[in-house]
Amino acid sequence: YIKDNKIDMLGEPLPNEDLDLQLIWLHAVETLGAKAVNAASLGEMWIGLIPPNWNEYGIGKNNMRRGLIPPLSGDYENLWKHSNGAWIRTEIWACCFPGMINKVTQMAFEDACVDHGFGEGTYAAIFVAALEAVAFFNNNINDLLEIGLSKIPESSRVSRSVRLVMDCYEK
């Protein structure tokens, strides 16, 4: 509660939507089964279970309420579709499907496209999910980066940026 303009959670941890989203996605896998989890089912959970409405979250939810289905929900009139909200919630997919690169990148896409459409935010989620899934079995950072890069378009800003950093590091 708020008292004297200060938040007092009485010793309770503060909510963290990045963790909360991953717990809801785990709930989706457990209740629907991995094969039934897709952008549409995740979109329904966004609307029913996820309170924040800021930035890409709000745009995606409002677009779904208007009748736009993912990935259009994350793409239409979304100034934040290139932001980082999706890749920071990919750990759950890597933990559910370790080493299963094709499955984990599909799940990252299904998740990210709801609020990031076809933007760079979706490419970032796919890139990160792929390297996280492989990291269970391979700790070579260059291998991980190359595997992640192999799953996104070379022309994407994410790919170009990662390759630029890798080149700078090499030099």
Segments (PLM) and residue ranges:
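Structured, active/binding-site neighborhoods that engage oxygen-rich ligands
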Residues: 1-171
